[in-house]
Amino acid sequence: MGSDDQSAADKIQKGFQINYMILRDADSGKIIWQENKDFSAPDVEHEARVPVKILDMRAVSREINFSTVESMENFRLDQKVLFKGRIMEEWFFEMGFVGASTTNTWQSTIEAAPESQMMPAKVLNGNVTIQTSFYDNETLITKSVVRLYYI
């Protein structure tokens, strides 16, 4: 990454903030979990306490509300689900252009793995991290790590 790319990434990162995150049952629309917290801080391992019933859902809708000072040409994210540090799943999401000085809501649906591939909550509890890397094109803006606890 050249110094121009790095300075652009620094400007975007300084003006980028997650305002809240919501997880819903994708079938009913009912809120399962909500947190009004900035999960975008890169040097912190965040924690989320999520109801165990989320593991029984066919699909989960994730809503991220974020604000940005700088515009982004192609906002996207790479999300990895890790169990004890090993990648179990990886998803790629692309939002596209994001205007400067805006607040945006991005909703995406994540379908559950087949039941035969699911592990019990007691095994997953505290051992799962979600690593989300936010990009503008190929420029990394920030990386968020959230450790999951099932309640």
UniProtKB/Swiss-Prot annotation:
Keyword Membrane among UniProt keywords: no
UniProt superkingdom: Eukaryota
GO cellular component, one term: cytoplasm
InterPro entries per UniProt: Ig_E-set (IPR014756), PDED_dom (IPR008015), PDED_dom_sf (IPR037036), Rhodop-sen_GMP-Pdiesterase_dsu (IPR017287)
Keywords, in A-Z order: cGMP, Cytoplasm, Nucleus
Pfam families linked: GMP_PDE_delta
GO biological process: sensory perception of light stimulus
Compartments (UniProt record): Nucleus; Cytoplasm
Subunit structure comment from the entry: Interacts with Pde6.
Family affiliation: Belongs to the PDE6D/unc-119 family.
Protein name: Probable cGMP 3',5'-cyclic phosphodiesterase subunit delta
Lineage: Eukaryota, Metazoa, Ecdysozoa, Arthropoda, Hexapoda
